[in-house]
């Protein structure tokens, strides 16, 4: 049995004592067969596992170690498009501060969080929100979120940043700055992996001035019927790179070789996705992998996704000339980042309308 409730926060639904989730949250029948118990899925040792890449030697003076690290990164980006990265250079205590600040924000009452509510109708996408049923299926996801631009500093709107807890702004700001430095290192290594100059990919996605870091804190409340719902439906990221921190509760699944693979919770790691932007620039040599988020009955899951995105209109995304040949013609038409986002939304609406 399912209930019908629309226009409320998922957290409010979850804490109301419902035993059946509203029908808007129930996934289509063809998806339900692949949704399992995430804790059981995480324990599985057989089958493919998301690669873990040690970045300690990413910029090592020792050429042999550096080359080995770059090769492992390239292999993961080529074969998977996602990896767990360790020894990434971001202080563990800073990651803990970010986790604590985000959790404390979401531990406030819904009424308190509503002070930061976004308003898609008026174009204010930053702030506290939930998925709107604005697609052809009317489908909803079992999550609330907080979304805001965190870097560069001069493009931030501090009026929307949480004032409580007091460490939210300093911790998140420092974390964003560290991630921006890590993005440069990763983009350099990925450039070299394509036979390009090391600064090339960063330049193509906007450079130090224009590459934007957008943070989305995903809050997945406990779900009474996790076998029927998804926290985030299957998608690829439009970004260049995405870095994900989480609270060590499993949920992320990757669609690899025709099957859903659960990412294990690796201590002190970040999950890093290659996004569509890098897939396009590399002419498909680096992969943007399809992924989704499962929910559970027992534990709240929180993840901090930071999307490194090019400017929406200034840059034309297309395969770089060096990645194209007679044998490997361009796989993607030229588009701005905004056009790529629009194309994905339009295509999804078309697919839903055809069902």
Curated annotation (Swiss-Prot):
The reaction(s) catalysed by this protein are: a (2R,3S,4S)-leucoanthocyanidin + 2-oxoglutarate + O2 = a 4-H-anthocyanidin with a 3-hydroxy group + succinate + CO2 + 2 H2O
The GO terms describing molecular function are: L-ascorbic acid binding; leucocyanidin oxygenase activity; metal ion binding; oxidoreductase activity, acting on paired donors, with incorporation or reduction of molecular oxygen, with 2-oxoglutarate as one donor, and the other dehydrogenated
- Annotated residues that bind 2-oxoglutarate are located at 218-220, 301-303
Q: What is its EC number?
A: 1.14.20.4
Residue ranges of every copy of the Fe2OG dioxygenase domain listed in the record? 211-310
Q: Detail which positions bind substrate.
A: 145, 216, 236, 309, 344
Protein origin, superkingdom:
Eukaryota
Q: In which pathway does it act?
A: Pigment biosynthesis; anthocyanin biosynthesis
Q: Which Pfam families match?
A: 2OG-FeII_Oxy, DIOX_N
- Give the cofactors, semicolon-separated: L-ascorbate; Fe(2+)
Q: Which GO terms describe its biological process?
A: anthocyanin-containing compound biosynthetic process
Q: Which residues bind Fe cation?
A: 235, 237, 291
For this protein, what does the record note about how its cofactor is bound?
Binds 1 ascorbate molecule per subunit.
Q: Does the keyword Ribonucleoprotein apply?
A: no
Q: Which PROSITE patterns match?
A: FE2OG_OXY (PS51471)
Q: Keywords in alphabetical order, please.
A: Dioxygenase, Flavonoid biosynthesis, Iron, Metal-binding, Oxidoreductase, Vitamin C
Which segments cross the bilayer?
A: none
Q: In which tissues is it expressed?
A: Expressed in stems and leaves. Expressed at low levels in ovaries.
Q: What PANTHER family does this protein map onto?
A: OXOGLUTARATE/IRON-DEPENDENT DIOXYGENASE (PTHR47991)
What is the role of the protein in this entry? Involved in anthocyanin biosynthesis by catalyzing the oxidation of leucoanthocyanidins into anthocyanidins. Required for the accumulation of anthocyanin in red-fleshed kiwifruit varieties.
UniProt family annotation: Belongs to the iron/ascorbate-dependent oxidoreductase family.
Recorded protein name is: Anthocyanin synthase
Q: Which organism is it from?
A: Actinidia chinensis var. chinensis (Chinese soft-hair kiwi)
Q: Gene encoding it?
A: LDOX
